[in-house]
Structure formats: C-alpha cells, structure tokens
C-alpha cells in the first residue's frame, strides 16, 4: 500500500535565488522566513543545521526553528562548507589566497577550531576534502592523491601516497579503511589495486586486490559496513570509446571475496546500496541502459527495467526507486516498487538538476536550476509514484532548492539494517494513525497487509502496489 499522506504543513523548502535565501511551505507557496534580502552564494543543509554563505560571510542556522545559531564574523572569503555525518564537525573552505584555507570546527564544543590545512586543489576536484571516521575520532585529509589521517588532537597518525579514492569502515568494533591506489614500477608503468587497511596496523595493507587500469574511482559501502562496491573508471586515452571503460567490483570484507560484477557492455551510469543495506542497484550499458538489482552479498536477483536512464534515486525506506534520465537525456522518470518490482508511475522533468526524496519517502523534490539553464527555472514536488502535486515556475533564476530536514527523535531511524526492527516500528506507528495497518517482514523483504479498517486520508484513497504474493520457501541464498 502507498505511504499515508497526511498534514503537509511540516514540509519546508529552502530556496536561493536573486531575491535572496528564504524558507517556504511549498504546498501553499507561503514564504515563512527570509534570511537574506540580496543574492547569496550558497546554502548547505544537514540534519541539525543549515549554512548560508553571503558575501563571503558564513551564518549557521538551526533546522528546528530556523533561528541564527552562529555568525562566523572572524571568517572571510568563505566559498564552501561541509558537515560531518553526525553534525559534530563543520569544515569551512576559504579562498586559496588564505594561507590556511581549510578549517575544521567542533560544533558540539563551543565551535572550537580543532585543525586547519592548506588545500592545494579546488574542492570540486576531490569533495569533500575532509572526511571523518564513523566514530568521528579520526580525520581524513585528502589533497590531490595524498591521504593524511589525524586524530582529534591534531596528531598525524599516518600518511599515504598515490590514493585515488577511499572510504572509512567500522563494524563489530573493528576499524578499517578501503582505498584505490597505484604504484609506479621500475619500467615506469603503473600497477593499480584496491587495498584494505586495518587500524591495528596501518604500516601495510591487510588485503591487496589487483585490478585493471584506473583513472578515477567511486567507492560505496553498505549500511552494515561489510560490503564495498568499487567503480573503477578508465578514461581511455586511446580515444577508442567516448565513455572509456568502467567496471564494478564487489568486495566482502569478512570473507575477502572479491568479484567483478557482470554488466552489459558500456558505461556505468550510477550505482547505489539501498538505505536498509539489503540490496544494491546498478544502472549500466549503452542506451537504453539496463537497471539490475543485486543482493547485498553480490548475487544477482533480477532486472528492474531497461530505458534511457542514468540516475538512481532510492527512497529512504528502501521501498521505492525512481529511475531517471537527466543531464543530456530527455528527463524521463519511471517509478518502481522494490517490494514486488512493479512499475507504479511515470513522469518527465526535462533539464532537472536536483532530485531528492523527502525523509518520509512520500515525496520527491526536483528543480531546474540556473546552473543548467538561465530561463524557465522551476521546482516540482511529486508523490512516490510520480504524480505531481506542486509545480512552481520562477520568473527568474533559481540557484538552490532543497528540502529542509529537521532532527526528529520520533522519526523512524532508517540507519538500522535490521528490517524486522524497522517493520515493528512502522507497524506501531501505523496502528496509532490508521486503526491497524500491519507490516510484516519476510527474509529481508517487506510485505504490506491491511487488517484494520481503512479510514479516509487527505488524498481520499489508498492505492495498492500489487497483489500480495503467497509466501514461498526460500533457500539459503535468498536469506
């Protein structure tokens, strides 16, 4: 069944355009608060805070009540900011003319400046240049191809050269990081590999996984931190292919299983783990591209779709996926249920730049920004199935448009990869609100049944996502 649609007053959108930065309620087009009355340069949002950069000055606001939380009067020429995962740290990037142009502040300890660096590259080339370990006790500084690891007392733990990309990993009280790296042989040729480092001994990698020529790499880690996807990209200097060559490798840390995922010939457009950590999705191949679903252990499960797609957007509750053809494509979007694989809707949003789910997985916010075209800027809000509920065309240029999220202790936490636990949490909430909507979990897949009385909701209907299937016996591979 579809997500229940209730009061829309809590949905808020941050807009940045020529009129300034302001907050509005999109369903009623009501401006709630203005933060600047002139054009500003950037808005960045996290869970607890959002930052506005105006004339090189940085202001920090609370997402809870949009009050001014901190004005950084002593910082000038700010060009970008980045929040750590748990909003404990704020990284501020200043213009290159500043000697120490990359600064890290502890937001939970009176904005203490805990470290600062000299960045020798533009942040877009390796963004974010600063990352943190999952426990936020270690700081990674990535500059060009050099990776330095510090503790929160400014002590250098180790330094690594020839790094193309990396990710921090923590599970079962064990701390690692994975990286794509290369070495230069005596004959001048480069040898590429993926490596796993254990924090108990950073002097040498605990695993070395050889791979083919790699110019660039994208790395994604599953929610339980036990599975890693490496997208190795060869830009192909021979010019035999416009797209170059691209492969995806799967690595299981606990068993050291390392395999190349079999995909259609052509570029890899996008790939992502589902937020609940049970699957990953890959969009690959020459157009029309193929979108395939895999179990988290790397085993192929099924094809989802084939079409002019290059972007994957999975809902936070892992129940829906929007497959999009953005960028140079025509903007076609198809919406699928990840529960039964059904196509549940279609739409088109030509020239869309940003496209994101709301926290509750009910809506998606998309926008045409001036970074793509200077005219016909607009934003739209769609339901999970592509049905448009808000279309707001702007007479001028829009530079940023994003949902403003608010930290809510009562919100269902999707950082749990135990689906059974999530299902029980959902079940309790639905029973309170609808008189008995029951959700059950079977071997990692959520099935939806309604054993209570249906009551009217704002949309006046409850739409099913397909008939409930009979339970089948599963073998071990399906568990």
Question: What are these model-predicted stretches?
Answer:
Residues 3-10, 41-49, 80-89, 129-138, ...:
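Blade-terminus and WD-like Trp-Asp/Gly-His loop motifs, strongest in beta-propeller folds
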Residues 15, 52, 92, 141, ...:
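Residue position within the beta-strands of beta-propeller blades
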Residues 29-35, 67-72, 112-120, 155-160, ...:
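A short beta-strand motif characteristic of beta-propeller blades
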Residues 105-106, 192-199, 244-254, 337, ...:
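Beta-propeller blade signature
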Residues 181-188, 231-245, 367-377:
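Short, conserved, GDST-rich strand-edge loop motifs in beta-rich repeat architectures
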Residues 211-317:
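Beta-propeller domains
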Residues 307-310, 342-356, 388-402:
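Conserved blade-ending motifs and adjacent loop-strand segments that build the rim/top face
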Residues 375-479:
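Terminal intrinsically disordered, low-complexity extensions flanking WD-repeat/beta-propeller proteins
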């Amino acid at each position: 069944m579809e997500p229940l649609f209730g009061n829309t007053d809590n949905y808020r959108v941050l807009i940045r355009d020529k009129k300034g930065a302001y907050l509005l309620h999109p369903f009623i087009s009501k401006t709630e608060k203005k933060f600047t009355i002139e054009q500003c340069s950037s808005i960045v949002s996290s869970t607890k805070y959002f930052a506005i950069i105006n004339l090189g000055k940085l202001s920090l606001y609370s997402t809870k009540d949009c009050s001014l939380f901190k004005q950084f009067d002593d910082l000038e020429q700010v060009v970008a900011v980045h929040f750590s995962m748990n909003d404990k740290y704020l990284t501020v990037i200043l213009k290159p003319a500043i000697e120490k142009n990359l600064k890290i502040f502890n937001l939970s300890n009176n904005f203490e400046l805990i470290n600062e660096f000299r960045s020798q590259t533009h942040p877009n080339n390796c963004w974010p240049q600063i990352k943190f370990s999952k426990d936020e006790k270690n700081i990674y500084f990535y500059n060009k191809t050099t990776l330095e690891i510090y503790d929160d007392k400014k002590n250098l733990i180790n330094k690594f050269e020839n790094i193309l990309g990396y990710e921090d990993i923590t599970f079962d009280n064990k701390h690692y990081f994975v990286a794509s790296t290369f070495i230069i042989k005596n004959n001048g040729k480069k040898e590429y590999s993926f490596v796993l480092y254990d924090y108990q001994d950073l002097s040498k990698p605990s695993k070395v996984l050889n791979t083919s020529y790699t110019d660039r790499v994208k790395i994604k880690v599953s929610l339980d931190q036990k599975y890693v996807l490496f997208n190795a990209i060869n830009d192909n200097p021979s010019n035999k292919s416009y797209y170059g060559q691209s492969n995806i490798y799967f690595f299981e840390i606990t068993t050291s299983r390392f395999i190349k995922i079999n995909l259609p010939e052509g570029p890899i457009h996008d790939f992502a783990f589902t937020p609940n950590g049970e699957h990953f999705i890959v969009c690959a191949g020459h157009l029309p591209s193929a979108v395939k679903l895999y179990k988290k252990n790397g085993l192929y499960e099924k094809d989802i779709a084939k079409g002019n797609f290059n972007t994957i957007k999975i809902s936070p509750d892992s129940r829906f996926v929007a497959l999009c053809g953005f960028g140079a494509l025509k903007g076609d979007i198809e919406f699928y249920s990840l529960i039964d694989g059904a196509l549940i809707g279609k739409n088109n949003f030509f020239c869309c730049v940003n496209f994101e789910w709301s926290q509750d997985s009910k809506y998606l916010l998309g926008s045409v920004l001036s970074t793509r075209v200077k005219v016909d800027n607009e934003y739209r809000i769609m339901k999970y199935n592509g049905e448009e509920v808000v279309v707001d065309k702007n007479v001028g240029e829009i530079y940023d448009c994003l949902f403003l999220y608010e930290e809510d202790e009562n919100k269902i936490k999707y950082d749990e990869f135990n689906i059974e636990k999530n299902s029980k949490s959902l079940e309790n909430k639905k029973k309170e609100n609808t008189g008995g909507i029951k959700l059950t979990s079977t071997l990692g897949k959520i099935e939806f049944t309604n054993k209570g009385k249906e009551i009217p909701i704002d949309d006046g209907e409850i739409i099913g996502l397909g008939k409930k299937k009979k339970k089948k016996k599963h073998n071990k591979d399906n568990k």
